[in-house]
A protein has these predicted regions:
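Non-catalytic, C-terminal membrane-associated alpha-helical segments of glycosyltransferases
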Residues: 151-222
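Nucleotide-sugar-dependent glycosyltransferase catalytic core
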Residues: 115-136, 169-176
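Catalytic beta-strand/loop signature of glycosyltransferases that borders the donor
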Residues: 20, 106-118, 128, 153
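Conserved donor NDP-sugar-binding/catalytic core segment of glycosyltransferases
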Residues: 1-42
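A recurrent flexible, glycine/aromatic-enriched loop bordering the glycosyltransferase active site
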Residues: 30-31, 42-43, 50-74, 88, ...
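A short, conserved alpha-helix in the catalytic core of glycosyltransferases
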Residues: 3-4, 62-113
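Alpha-helical elements of Rossmann-like donor-binding domains used by nucleotide-donor carbohydrate transfer enzymes
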Residues: 3-6, 94-95, 137, 177-184
Length: 222
């Protein structure tokens, strides 16, 4: 906790800070070295399953995993708190994305160590509950945080990303749950929950978009 607090103090624009999350059952491997999101509509934990030494640098990340993070309260008061619709899965990506729109940063503090049991609540990496609510919340998060033109810009990538995931979960025997989640995501997308577009945030959207593209490369090659 001390290491994360000190990291927040070092970075005045930081909204959140995440610890280095190590797999509880294999303490030589990372569980999460910072959360990232890409134009395919995929969120991912950096270097998951790799050696813990691969994420030693304190640096900016797309968002902090709420499993081991701290947040600056005064920023919550400006941008709003966690969305109750995101009661499970991607709630941390959603709030971190929103903070980025407002010009804040999310940081990774490798000196702060947490041993994490992945999927400790849902029980397994792939199950009906997790599959349905992850796809649901992903659609909802995109709707909330991307202006209409940005959605159009990313649409070809999103179609590929969601199509690939659909095929993946069909092969896992979870295709029905994944598609049901997508449908539910559209159903809960309400205009009053969308982050209001403001001209003062234009450059923040540009920076986010460049990172969304770059993170596709990061996902497969880094």
């Amino acid at each position: 906790m001390k290491e994360m607090v000190e990291a927040l103090r070092r970075h005045k624009k930081a909204f959140s800070c995440q610890a280095r999350m190590i797999q509880f059952h294999d303490r030589e491997k990372l569980d999460d070295g910072g959360n990232f999101y890409c134009s395919l509509g995929w969120g991912f934990a950096r270097n998951k399953g790799k050696a813990i030494e691969t994420c030693e640098k304190e640096e900016k990340i797309f968002s902090s995993c709420a499993g081991a993070a701290i947040y600056r309260k005064k920023v919550f008061e400006k941008i709003g708190y966690f969305d109750e619709e995101h009661f499970a899965y991607l709630e941390d990506m959603d709030i971190g994305y929103r903070a980025r729109i407002y010009g804040y940063e999310n940081w990774y503090a490798p000196k702060a160590l947490v041993y994490h049991v992945g999927s400790g609540t849902s029980g397994s990496r792939y199950n009906q509950f997790k599959t349905r609510y992850s796809s649901r919340n992903n659609v909802y998060m995109i709707y909330k945080n991307m202006p209409f033109l940005q959605i159009l810009l990313n649409l070809p990538f999103l179609l590929v990303g969601f199509g690939t995931k659909t095929l993946f979960f069909v092969l896992k025997g979870l295709g029905r749950e994944y598609i049901a989640g997508i449908k539910n995501g559209f159903q809960i997308s309400h205009r009053e929950k969308k982050v209001p577009f403001k001209l003062e945030h234009c450059m923040n959207y540009v920076h986010i978009q460049v990172e969304l593209w770059y993170n596709m490369f990061r996902r497969f090659f880094m």
